[in-house]
């Protein structure tokens, strides 16, 4: 199928007309600053808009600028981020904030190239900040824009291929409205998020690109965009130990690197253990169980791995230097990953 890149240029004017009437009302758009755009875009990576809104508002209330973000204790930062997942995003935000304060006078740099020198800011985020806040005509190319562009142009190449993404970026940069680059990027984001939907369910009847869209004209909306299949996730069985001693619950700090780095978790062991296995695992930790009872099961899906978890409550005696015994206040202050959300609620209900 022949690509029709000129369709992207033809889309620009009707797209902006559509956006002026249908653009989403979002908290980071009601009050627009480079800092707010930056934080919102980082939060929106891998996370739905509806889920981000309350986190964004809470974050802004406590950390309204780069100076506040640069100096907040990491434990508090991770607690504010709790539930959003991908905690390296929060750590990179703080690393970048420290550079912004030390090297840029507390204000984000105005150019895309300079923004990309900051930790955690890649091509897409830099383009979003630079276009929305400073009027730089650069396309913020993410999955939404690639999907729209692939369908409108009829490009059947793999959008996950770096060379193909570079080609799309060049054509989108050519199509961007020079007078309203920020509005163009937001319009494409909104079109992809609300109309040109993934998984074969686009709302073509209300799409401003309908008359120039190759996928619509050729019945290919369920085929485009083309993307290589992801590798199957590894499934890992884990037994989660919800331990209590003297009215406190056991937490353990994860390693400083890797998955869920530096966050608090419940002790766990690989495998699907029964009560006898739990008793043995506790003995290997230097603990003895006075009682053991099932605490249900939970599942959590990461990008490349899936945890199938079974939990047990246990009242224990003994000591283990890797464990921190948290009362209710300390438990509430700890940053515990969403992976353990179900178990955290069960533990919290038992703490006085």
Label each PLM-derived region with a short phrase.
Residues 1-25, 30, 193-352:
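Intrinsically disordered, low-complexity, charged terminal extensions of DNA damage-control enzymes
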Residues 3-9, 13-205, 209-222, 287-288:
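Catalytic cores of DNA base-excision repair glycosylases
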């Amino acid at each position: 199928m022949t690509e029709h890149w000129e369709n992207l240029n033809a889309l620009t004017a009707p797209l902006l007309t559509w956006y002026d009437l249908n653009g989403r009302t979002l908290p980071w758009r009601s009050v627009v600053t480079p800092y707010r755009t930056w934080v919102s875009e980082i939060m929106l990576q891998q996370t739905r808009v509806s889920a981000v809104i309350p986190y964004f508002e809470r974050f802004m209330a406590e950390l309204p600028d780069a100076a506040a973000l640069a100096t907040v204790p990491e434990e508090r930062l991770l607690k504010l981020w709790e539930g959003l997942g991908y905690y390296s995003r929060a750590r990179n935000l703080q690393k970048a904030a420290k550079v912004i304060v030390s090297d840029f006078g507390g204000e984000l740099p105005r150019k895309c190239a300079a923004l990309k020198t900051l930790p955690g800011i890649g091509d897409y985020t830099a383009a979003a900040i630079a276009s929305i806040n400073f009027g730089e005509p650069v396309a913020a190319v993410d999955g939404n824009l690639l999907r729209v562009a692939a369908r409108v142009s009829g490009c059947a190449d793999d959008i996950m291929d770096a060379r193909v993404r570079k080609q799309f970026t060049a054509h989108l940069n050519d199509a961007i409205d020079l007078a309203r680059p920020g509005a163009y990027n937001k319009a494409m984001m909104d079109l992809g998020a609300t109309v040109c939907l993934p998984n074969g369910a686009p709302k073509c009847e209300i799409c401003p690109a309908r008359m120039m869209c190759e996928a619509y004209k050729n019945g290919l909306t369920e085929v485009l965009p083309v993307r290589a299949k992801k590798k199957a996730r590894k499934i890992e069985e884990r037994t989660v130990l919800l331990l209590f001693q003297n009215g406190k619950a056991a937490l353990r700090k994860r390693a400083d690197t890797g998955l869920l780095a530096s966050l608090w978790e419940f002790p766990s062991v690989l495998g699907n253990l029964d009560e006898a296995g739990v008793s043995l695992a506790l003995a290997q930790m230097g603990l003895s169980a006075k009682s053991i009872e099932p605490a249900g099961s939970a599942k959590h899906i990461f990008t490349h791995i899936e945890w199938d978890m079974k939990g047990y409550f246990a009242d224990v005696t003994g000591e283990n230097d890797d464990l921190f015994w948290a009362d209710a206040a300390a438990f509430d202050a700890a940053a515990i990953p969403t992976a353990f959300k179900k178990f955290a609620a069960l533990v919290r209900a038992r703490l006085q």
